[in-house]
From Swiss-Prot:
This is 7-cyano-7-deazaguanine synthase. Its cofactor is Zn(2+). Catalyzes the ATP-dependent conversion of 7-carboxy-7-deazaguanine (CDG) to 7-cyano-7-deazaguanine (preQ(0)). It is an enzyme of class 6 (ligase). Pathway: Purine metabolism; 7-cyano-7-deazaguanine biosynthesis. The keyword Glycosyltransferase does not apply. Binds 1 zinc ion per subunit. The keyword Zinc applies. GO terms for molecular function: ATP binding; ligase activity, forming carbon-nitrogen bonds; zinc ion binding.
Length: 231
């Protein structure tokens, strides 16, 4: 039996990954992390979506220690989430240091226990927003280290790594989940479901991607299929 574990936040990217995994694996588990995040409403959204999309199990893990160590606008109410700035340089204050290091490592430990062959994460280098832990180089390096440390061959899969946000919408549509992703996921840094606050960087990427996809469906779908190998 083919099993996979999805690092699942209930946002656009991880929900699209879950929708695809349900078609590609016999059994899919979801792992969601409570780190005291500002947008903590995502945990309840993730619970509902994991159930709706047929995950075999859904674990919510308490990693609030990360909140104590990592200072970010997503872990401190005293630090405002900035509005989207198209020409911003450097790492944004929404970056949570160590988050994906911790999430992927814990998901791999869970995968070890349930005998899953893959850990799936929705990180993306095309629209990575300046986060160093969303890069392909990082994911591959951590995958190698985790496998060495557990003497196990668990594969870190990144289905969205080389597609942009419009193509991510196309992928959700390909699996018949466009409206669910649009209406029921939570991507917004301010914790607003669906189309979100409309001001933060996450909402801007999501909205621009959707608008581009809806305006150029055939071309974007074709590009997505070419990049992912789907037919």
């Amino acid at each position: 039996m083919k099993r996979a574990v999805v690092v699942f936040s209930g946002g656009q990217d991880s929900t699209t990954c879950l929708a695809q995994a349900r078609h590609q694996y016999d059994e899919v588990h979801c792992v969601t992390f409570d780190y005291g995040q500002r947008h903590r409403a995502e945990i309840d959204v993730a619970r509902a979506l994991a159930l709706k999309l047929g995950a075999r199990a859904h674990k919510v893990l308490d990693v609030t220690l990360l909140n104590e160590l990592a200072v970010s606008s997503l872990t401190r109410d005293s630090i405002p989430v900035p509005d989207y700035e198209p020409n911003a340089d450097g790492i944004p204050n929404t970056f949570v240091p160590g988050r994906n290091i911790l999430f992927l490592t814990l998901a791999a430990i869970y995968a070890y226990q349930v005998k899953a062959e893959a850990v799936i994460t929705g990180v993306c280098e095309t629209d990575f927003s300046g986060y160093p832990d969303c890069r392909d180089e990082f994911v591959k390096a951590l995958n190698h280290a985790v496998n060495l440390g557990m003497a196990k061959d668990i594969r870190f899969e990144t289905p969205l790594m080389w597609i942009d946000k419009a193509e991510t919408w196309a992928l959700a549509d390909y699996w018949g989940q466009l409206e669910l992703v649009r209406e029921e996921t939570l991507t917004c840094y301010n914790g607003i479901k669906g189309d979100g606050c409309g001001h933060c960087a996450a909402c801007n990427l999501r909205a621009n991607g959707l608008n581009h996809y809806l305006s150029n469906k055939a071309a974007v779908m074709a590009a997505m299929k070419q990049k992912t190998g789907l037919r």
